[in-house]
Amino acid sequence: MKVVFVSYEVFPFAKVGGLADVAGTLPKYLKKHGVDVTIVMPKHRIVEKNAEKFGYEIKKVAEGLSVSHVKTDQKFDIYESVLPGSDVKTYFVANDYYFSAEDVYAGPDLGEQAIFFCAATLDLVKHLDLKPDIVHVNDWQTALIPVYLKTVYRDDPYFSRTATVLTIHNLGYQGVFDPKYLSFAGLPDYVFTIDGLEFYRQLNFLKGGIVFSDVINTVSPTYAEEIQTEEYGEKLEGVLRMRSKDLYGILNGIDYELYNPATDRYIYVNYDVNRLELKWENKVKLQEELGLPVNKETAVAGLISRLVPQKGLDLLVDVMDYLMLFDLQIVVLGTGDEQYENAFRKFQERYPDKVSANIKFDVELAQKIYAGADIFLMPSRYEPCGLGQMFSMRYGTIPVVRYTGGLADTVKEYDPQSMEGTGFGFKKYDSAHLLKAVSKALHFYYREKDHWRRIMTNAMNTDLSWDRSAKEYVDLYKKALAKVGR
């Protein structure tokens, strides 16, 4: 089975969010399950910069190629590399006009950029003769590929047996643009209807992918159900319900080789489930590095997140003053909306011995927080899957979450009777319930140390690997092939 896996970001070539982790890991595990997978992504400026840092080579293999169907004179080149730690070939669509911004999700025109990349990807596939059985696209930036295949390429024998899979990592980002982009894309007018890409008189790229893909999945079973409701559907619940028989939920995994406290080169002291006492050495070193009072007994809670409303930060801001009444230090890492960046900076000014606000993106510090914290906070308003809680569990750091989406599928409330469970959480979206959940976690941390150690052990022994997920994706590909009569 040949799969072309298309993503706007892939770790370590370019990373902004969790999509990069998925796209940089799932293909490796698909390969282990016998799938012949090739990655295609844009050649962002950061790709060249990361080459030396992450030890990969990148070379040009074609240049000056025209883009079919799109009304543009822009050409593209093809570059090639190999995904580090694997033999997965990765091809890059290179164009200095569209992909020269420092930010992966920036550029002169995001609509044109996505259209150009989608169309160029299909030209790349034909130019390199990749002969895919499956084209697997991710999020709105790549969602027009199934639209192209089902319309302007419908009678092209090269793609006649190719099936499409769309993975929705976050329904909140849809790629909604003026209808004029339809002409630029070279797509037929008939797709701009209520049953196609039309969305409140605008053009919705993600909706196009939902309508035209053979099968669709999102990144947790709970989120697949949630997005068919008005509360979580982001005005697409109707079309998602129409495709419900082709809509699946597959939990993301994490790379157990990369995220392993026993071998992680970024953390201060390596440890494993049988040497948990070494974890506290990471806490002390983290406190030292961040200028917090050093005390291995004091509970440390970590928050590693984009600082945006989706992440439930309004709840945390509401209860920060109350949390400061506990023997608790809070370490924040992330960037995002100015209101949240400034809020956490002010909390650090107000509580310099209890709050460390690190308003930046720092992979090394993130690993140190996963290893050095006792508690990990994820009070998300919604969470398609979430990777932070998986990383934290892998490192024995106990998640306190809102039970929504993938958080509900991965974190199980600890039951002191059965001694089963991996964390703590709450369902109702309000600050009082968050405060209660954190308070409960702190009770076990300070007063039920045997139970706390059991929760850590449970968390670290939970199977959150990509191996499990990859098997489910292979099954999903078979369902997609069945849709095209294979």
Curated annotation (Swiss-Prot):
**Its Gene Ontology biological processes?**
glycogen biosynthetic process
Kindly state which keywords UniProt assigns to this record, in alphabetical order: Glycogen biosynthesis, Glycosyltransferase, Transferase
Q: What Gene Ontology terms describe what this protein does at the molecular function level?
A: alpha-1,4-glucan glucosyltransferase (ADP-glucose donor) activity; alpha-1,4-glucan glucosyltransferase (UDP-glucose donor) activity
What's the EC number here?
2.4.1.21
What CDD domains has UniProt attached to this entry? GT5_Glycogen_synthase_DULL1-like (cd03791)
Q: State the source organism's domain of life.
A: Bacteria
Q: Which reaction does it catalyse?
A: [(1->4)-alpha-D-glucosyl](n) + ADP-alpha-D-glucose = [(1->4)-alpha-D-glucosyl](n+1) + ADP + H(+)
Known pathway? Glycan biosynthesis; glycogen biosynthesis
Ligand binding (ADP-alpha-D-glucose): 15
Q: Which family does it belong to?
A: Belongs to the glycosyltransferase 1 family. Bacterial/plant glycogen synthase subfamily.
Provide the function of this protein: Synthesizes alpha-1,4-glucan chains using ADP-glucose.
In its UniProt entry, what is this protein called?
A: Glycogen synthase
Gene name of the record: glgA
